[in-house]
Amino acid sequence: MVKESSAFVRKLAHNDPATRKAAYDSLTNYLQSPAGTRLRFLDLEKLWKGLYFSMWYCDKPVPQQNLAGNLGELFSKVIPQEKLADFHRAFWAVFMREWHLIDKWRLDKYLMLVRRVLRHNFFRLCENGWKEQEVAEFVAVLEEYPLMNNMKFPQSLTYHICDIYLDELEYVVFKEFRDYSEESEDSEESADSGSDDDSDSDSEDENPRKADENGGKTEGKPQKLSEEEISEKKATIIAQTPVKALVAPFEKVAETLKNKALREKCKEELLDDKRLQTWAVVDGEESESE
């Protein structure tokens, strides 16, 4: 089991890429082994306590980005489906307890990790075809922790989720329209030097330009779509994405949460976002009247 004081945790945060990769491979092998599939919620909390500290010890920008991407990929590629909800709960449970201990020098890298975790949850749901039960489990975890109706969960962290939620959903569902040659770093990482390793890894995994359907390399430049064709394709994608179900817990927050400032934040940053109107999730007149 990973502990916050273990040498293994420090290897995950190591500046040497080979050392980091060996530690990450060891972690993924363990989680996919019979022993890993038997982990209980308490065990997963202990695991996340160790992973939390691996980010704590990670000091340089590129290793931080790499580690955040690797920890995010545990959600999209590693954890067995039957353990995913508990693994997700354990992540938030640890962050709920440890958030107030994060100093201003470490805050950005933890915000980046939250972004990666959200992104890779969306990648998993999208890859599995947005199955109703899996979406319901994902939403239930959000309602149980970051969107809970009391003051136990750090409000600043809930604010962050309101800020990034639609950005990350859009990043995932419209991945084929991203310009991989000019893709910029996320806003919270822009002050760091070096490349965004996780953006690179996402691009390699999800970039449709890398290979054709038969596994070969594409030849020449991809055919450029017109704005109308892009809009039509995006509309088709959104029609197949349960955006309303994914946004539903935020609607509940805006109506029932005790914290007035957070209710307003949720409305302004998410529910009033023009993208929801564009995607026909909310009616424009209805949004303005609220």
Give the positions of each predicted feature.
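Eukaryotic acidic, Ser/Thr-rich intrinsically disordered low-complexity regions
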Residues: 1-12, 148, 153, 160, ...
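Extreme N-terminal segments of fungal proteins
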Residues: 1-65, 72, 77
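Eukaryote-skewed repeat-based solenoidal scaffolds used as protein-protein interaction platforms
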Residues: 71-180
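Alpha-helical solenoid scaffolds in eukaryotic proteins
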Residues: 2-10, 29, 45-54, 70-73, ...
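Short coil/turn segments at helix-helix junctions and helix-capping linkers
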Residues: 7-19, 50-63, 97-106, 148-153, ...
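Boundary/linker elements of alpha-helical solenoid repeat scaffolds
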Residues: 26-38, 51-52, 68-79, 118-129, ...
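Short sequence/structural elements of tandem HEAT/ARM alpha-solenoid repeats
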Residues: 1-3, 22, 39-47, 82-90, ...
